[in-house]
Structure formats: structure tokens, C-alpha cells
From Swiss-Prot:
It catalyses: RNA(n) + a ribonucleoside 5'-triphosphate = RNA(n+1) + diphosphate. It is found in: Cytoplasm. This is DNA-directed RNA polymerase subunit Rpo12. Part of the RNA polymerase complex. The lineage of its organism: Archaea, Methanobacteriati, Methanobacteriota, Thermococci, Thermococcales.
Amino acid sequence: MVEAVYRCFKCGREVKLDLSITRDLRCPYCGSKILYKPRPKVPRRVKAI
């Protein structure tokens, strides 16, 4: 079971989808096909060269 958290671009809700059961990526609330993975809130530090 592969469950991933996505955020809908249209309504902004977080959606948990099980990708092993279905390949259809749609928001169950508004029906939008545009979903993206939210970034973590931890700031990243990159050492400059």
C-alpha cells in the first residue's frame, strides 16, 4: 500500500491517495486533476562553495 499526501491546486485541501489501488489522480472534493506534493516546512541550508 503506497499512500501519498497531495494538495489540490484548485481548492487547497490535502488529499491522501493510495496509488496502488487507483491511478486516477483527482481531488475527491472538487474533481480537479492538478495535484502537487507540498514541500516540508523545514528550511534547507546549502553550504556555499
